Structures are given as C-alpha cells and as structure tokens.
C-alpha cells in the first residue's frame, strides 16, 4: 500500500471547542469531551446550552492539545482545547475512524512538547494510504475489519483452550 502526506486541513474540517464555566453546565444526556485520556475523553454528561461558546459535533474524531484522540459516533459537546476532525467529503464509520485515530496517535505522540495548539494541528501533515492518488478509505475500513476478524479468531481459540483445560482438570 502506498502512503502519502496530507496537510490536516486539506483532509479534515477542524473545529475547536470552547470554555463553558462549570457552574453553567447542568447534568444531562450530552457527553462533554475534554482533554482527559480516560472514558473516551468524556468528562461528564450535560444539558445542551444555547450559547455561542457551546459547540456540539456528531460523528467526529476528537483531538486535544495533549494529544488524546478518540472517535465519537454520537452527539457530543467539546471543551476548550479539544478539536473535532471530520473528513472533507467522507462520512466516518467505526472502522475508518479507528484507523485514523491510531494514525493521529502515532503521528503526534510526543510532538510539540506534548502540547499541540490549533495552529500546530492545522499546519501538520498526516500520512494516509492512497490508491490512484486518492485517499483510500476503503483500505482503512478493510484493514481494521481484518484485525477485528483476527482478534475474534484468537478469542475463540483461547476460549476453546480454556474449556479444554477445565475438562482436563475435572479428569
């Protein structure tokens, strides 16, 4: 597979979250994505607000200034210093998103003294698979599905081994 470098902003719509004071957030159902590397970046669940600073995205990759990166197929609001990334002209699915999340994690691991500004992210390049000079999202999807299938076989294999081991212990 051939790979080529692409400027992040040539491939993704990059938007940022904004600070909402904690006292303005009320417990609710919409996940709030922060810079944490725990729980898929979710810091809590809150009611939607009608404020220009309240930014909501759906079906996107979150990328924080600390380099945390997750896929969110659901509607979520973004905290300050969290970016949303959506491919231009392509709708993410779980497989392509997982491929891209891992690429972003590898590409930005330890870069910029572990802090990545909006400016740095937008000027950055990411190496993506291409076919006929076009980004190959189909390859990304098949690649992750192949890994998933191999993992299922391994899980089945280990389950069979565990059953056989228990049977031997009973004898």
Describe each region flagged by the PLM.
Residues 128:
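IQ-motif-like calmodulin-binding regions
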Residues 10-125:
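DNA target-recognition domains and sequence-specific DNA-contacting regions of bacterial/archaeal
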